[in-house]
Every structure is written in C-alpha cells, then in structure tokens.
C-alpha cells in the first residue's frame, strides 16, 4: 500500500443537453469505457472515479463543491467530449480548490472516412469543445494542466500519471507537519524564512520542539527494541569491524538505534512527516543523529540539517511525488569542487545525512567515526556511493515577497578514484551546462547550499510542481546561458511584483 491508495481523481465529462438524450447516452458509455480502460491499462498511480455528466451550471458547481470537501479527491480530470459552453463552468471553477487537468482527447483515434456524418461530428467535438474550456480558464486566470492525446496512447498515460503525483502531493502537503528539533544554525540566512507565508502558500505547518522533549522519548526506548533493530542493521548493511558485536564502537551503534527508535516514535506520535535537526542544539543526545536520519528519509520522511525547514518540507513533497518510481531522492549539499578543464565535478554530501535510496550499493557500509562538529560522541552513519545517470538538485527559497524554486539538471558519474578516508555517503556529478555557468546562475538566483537531490524526478516534474503551487521556477540546464538567465530573473521580478 502507498500514499496513492488514500486518494482518487475524479473524471468529469463536460457536455450539454442541446444534443439530446441519445447523444448524452453515448457520451456516458464512452466515458465509462475510457475510465475502465485507464484504470486497468494505464498504470496510473491512483484510481480514476467517473462522476455524473456536467451538463448544466448547477451540476458542474455541485461536482466542484463536492470535490473540495471530499478528502479522498486529489483533483479533477475534465474531458470535453462534446461542446460544453464554458459560462456553465464559471461558478464551479471559481470555487474549485483542487488541481485540475484537462484531458484533450476523443473516443475514436482515426476518423471513419467513409461513414463520417454530422451525428459523428456532433458527438466528437473535443477539438473545439476543449478550446472553449481553455478560454474560460485563461479568462479567469486559473492555472490548469492540459494533456493532449488519444486515451490509449502511452505518452498520454505517462503525463496523466505524472500530474496525478503532483495532485496527490499537493493534498499531502496541505496536511504536512514539519518538526524542528531546535532552531536554525546560528547566523545562517538561507535556512531561515517566513513560516506563516509558507503555510499560506503551501499548506504545511512548521513548529519547534525542544530537543529535551525528544530526549525523553529516546531515553524511554527499551533494550529489547534496540536489539531487534540492531538485528535489522546486521541483515541490511555491511558492518565494519568496529561496529560488529565485539567491536569497540558497538555501543555507539546501539545508541544510534535508540535515537532512531525514539525519533520515529516522536514523529509518529506528533503526526510529523518532515523534521530538522541542528548540531548546535543536541543537549541530552549522545550523538548527532546520522544513521537514524538516513533510515527515516528512506522511509519517506523529509529532512534537512541546521533547521532548514524549507528543504525538509521539499524533500517530503518530492518523496511523495516519486513514490513507486525508479531511483531515489535525498537531502544533499554541494560540498566541494573538482576543477579540471572539460571535467569539472561537484562532490555532494553532508556531515552524515544522505538517504540510502540513492545508494548504488545493495548493502551500504555501517560505520562509526569521529565527528568534531557538535561536540558529541562518534556517530553511526551509512557510507555509500550514488547511482549514476541523469538527476536534478532543487532548492526552495524565500525571497520575502514570493517563493522561488531553483532546479539544476545534473549528470551523476562514477567516482574515478576510491575515497578511503571520506567517512560519509556522497554523490559526484557534472552540473549542466557546465560548472561555471551552473554555479554562477545558482548564486545569482539565491539558491541555497542545501538541496533535494533526485534520480526519480526530472525537470518536467518540478515545472509541474511550480505551476500547481503557483510559484516561480528558475531552471539551469544544458540550454542555460547566463545573459538570458539574468534577463529571466529580472523579468520574473517585474511579473511577480505586478502579480501581487
């Protein structure tokens, strides 16, 4: 069972009574056939539910009102099978607060050249019915997605499925609670921000709990539960000699297990699905949570270090979006560079907290090593390299008057040499279009040093995320040129200033 099983998407057919009962009967029949086929053949992440035809303003308004108040409804897919006068949709669309996708399709793929008549033409009017619907969306300044293609086309299935992921993630985000253990790292700017504005824009709440509250729960964990979790570690990871049963760091592993169990219990009891820690606020904890954070991220929790609640929330959102897809998604930080003509590289990592969902190794190494930052006992952590291939890094930043999503398309590569002294998980990548352009554009756009790294999602997913939440997006990819990128930032400043 996944999060998508908790939601459904309503399939709504637009028409009108002008065409008579027989035409509406055929429209309903076609709709039932299409919905059944999509549910069984399209591999969509959640179920489509066919609703009654929308043939009048009252019917359409009732559907939109019901969608708003049904917690299982993640959004609406609308198909204008015949012509459906768009003034009928104004009241419904004006109150609709769920995501909307217009499926610009028709029942038949090919025209019946020898038999086509006006009855056929009146029944299959998506070509201009869809344009009428599009006009009212533009006139009302309402953002909605559009997918064009025959309902049996696999590309259309893929695009509808990707939109469904966005719709479900938006509903999950409205209920998301972010727990901050302690505050932000002192004097850091980009990890701070307006939590009230974030809740108004996205729906997620951000609140702080004292580390002492967490410590109470951690200290309540029994030895039996710790031993059971250690057994799971033994079967899932390659333990270094120091962390094995008679190793000199075995107690550190047990303490890491205690912290993991306590953290998970605290998060579950509070209904939190994202959290932050900071190495400057660890009072009562024996080590900086490393292994615990890595494993919780792999279970779907959002996380970021140093109190960075925006990145923690974004990671949770992207975890939901990517559920069931190939590839992982993790908290990440651009840590250091490799400058080599024609082969500039970025080494990404963090002090400890990189999610094993992006690991190339089937069994990462579990080790305990010294960490000077935080001033605590040596923490346990998983060490691994990252899968290769196309990926993205994304940053959500607070500009005061709006949010900007910054995305850099990257290509992860195999580490050319072993890293025997690096005691943390890492990812190595080439930034698109090149490191100088990518880093300069990132800096000019105000991108954070913390990001969400993902092999599972791509630029199109993040564009849809920005559109569905109505926020700015700035893209750095192989098409990026700095003069044009700077111009786009200036134009966006004007556009969003006027939009306020």
UniProtKB/Swiss-Prot annotation:
Q: Tell me the GO molecular function terms.
A: L-arabinose isomerase activity; manganese ion binding
Supply the enzyme class, top level: isomerase
Details of cofactor binding: Binds 1 Mn(2+) ion per subunit.
Transit peptide as UniProt keyword: no
Keywords, A to Z, come to: Arabinose catabolism, Carbohydrate metabolism, Isomerase, Manganese, Metal-binding
| GO CC annotation, single | cytosol
Task: Quote the record's binding site residues for Mn(2+).
Answer: 306, 333, 350, 450
Reaction(s) catalysed (UniProt annotation): beta-L-arabinopyranose = L-ribulose
- Entry's InterPro entries? Ara_Isoase_C (IPR024664), AraA_central (IPR055390), AraA_N (IPR055389), AraA_N_sf (IPR038583), Fuc/Ara_isomerase_C (IPR004216), Fucose_isomerase_N/cen_sf (IPR009015), Lara_isomerase (IPR003762)
Specify whether Nucleotide-binding is a keyword of the entry: no
Pathway stated in the Swiss-Prot or TrEMBL entry: Carbohydrate degradation; L-arabinose degradation via L-ribulose; D-xylulose 5-phosphate from L-arabinose (bacterial route): step 1/3
**Which GO BP terms sit in this record?**
L-arabinose catabolic process to xylulose 5-phosphate
Question: Which E.C. number(s) belong to this protein?
Answer: 5.3.1.4
Q: Which family does it belong to?
A: Belongs to the arabinose isomerase family.
- Quaternary structure note: Homohexamer.
What this protein is reported to do is described as: Catalyzes the conversion of L-arabinose to L-ribulose.
Q: Could you tell me which NCBIfam families the record lists for this protein?
A: PRK02929.1
Q: What is this protein called?
A: L-arabinose isomerase
- Species for this entry: Salmonella paratyphi A (strain AKU_12601)
Which gene underlies this protein? araA
């Amino acid at each position: 069972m996944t999060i998508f099983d908790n939601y459904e998407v309503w399939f709504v057919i637009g028409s009108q009574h002008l065409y008579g009962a027989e035409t509406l009967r055929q429209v309903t029949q076609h709709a039932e056939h299409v919905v059944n086929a999509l549910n069984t053949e399209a591999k969509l992440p959640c179920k489509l539910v066919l609703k009654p035809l929308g043939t009048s303003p009252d019917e359409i308004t009732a559907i939109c009102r019901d969608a708003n108040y049904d917690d299982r409804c993640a959004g609406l897919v609308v198909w204008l099978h015949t012509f459906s006068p768009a003034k009928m949709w104004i009241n419904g669309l004006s109150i609709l607060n769920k995501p909307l996708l217009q499926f610009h399709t028709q029942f038949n793929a090919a025209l019946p050249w020898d038999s086509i008549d006006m009855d056929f033409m009146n029944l299959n009017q998506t070509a201009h019915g869809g344009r009428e619907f599009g006009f009212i969306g533009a006139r009302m300044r309402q953002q909605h997605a559009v997918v064009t293609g025959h309902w049996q086309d696999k590309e259309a299935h893929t695009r509808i499925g990707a939109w469904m992921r966005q719709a479900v993630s938006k509903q999950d985000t409205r209920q998301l609670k972010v727990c901050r253990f302690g505050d932000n790292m002192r004097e850091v700017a980009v990890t701070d921000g307006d939590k009230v504005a974030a809740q108004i824009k996205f729906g997620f709440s951000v609140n702080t709990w004292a580390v002492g509250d967490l410590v109470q729960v951690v200290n309540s964990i029994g030895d039996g539960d710790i031993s059971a979790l250690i057994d799971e570690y033994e079967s899932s990871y390659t333990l270094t000699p120091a962390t094995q049963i008679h190793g000199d760091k075995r107690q550190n592993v047990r303490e890491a297990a205690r912290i993991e169990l306590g953290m998970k219990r605290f998060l579950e009891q509070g209904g939190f699905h994202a959290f932050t820690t900071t190495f400057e606020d660890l009072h009562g904890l024996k080590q900086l949570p490393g292994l615990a954070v890595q494993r919780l991220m792999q279970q779907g929790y959002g996380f970021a270090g140093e109190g960075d609640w925006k990145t923690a929330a974004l990671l949770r959102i992207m975890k939901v979006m990517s559920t069931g897809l190939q590839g992982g998604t993790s908290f990440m930080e651009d840590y250091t560079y490799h400058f080599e003509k024609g082969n500039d590289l970025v080494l990404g990592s963090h002090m400890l907290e990189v999610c094993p969902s992006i690991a190339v190794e089937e069994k990462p190494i579990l080790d305990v090593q010294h960490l000077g930052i935080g001033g605590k006992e040596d923490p346990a952590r998983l060490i691994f390299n990252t899968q290769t291939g196309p990926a993205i890094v994304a940053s959500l930043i607070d500009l005061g008057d709006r949010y900007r999503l910054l995305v850099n398309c990257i290509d992860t590569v195999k580490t050319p040499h072993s890293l025997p002294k690096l005691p943390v998980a890492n990812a190595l990548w080439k930034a698109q279009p090149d490191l100088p352009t990518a880093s300069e554009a990132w800096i000019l756009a105000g991108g954070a040093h913390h990001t969400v790294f993902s092999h599972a999602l791509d630029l199109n997913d993040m564009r849809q995320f920005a559109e569905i939440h109505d926020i700015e997006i700035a893209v750095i990819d192989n098409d990026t040129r700095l003069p044009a990128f700077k111009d786009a930032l200036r134009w966006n400043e004007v556009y969003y200033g006027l939009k306020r």
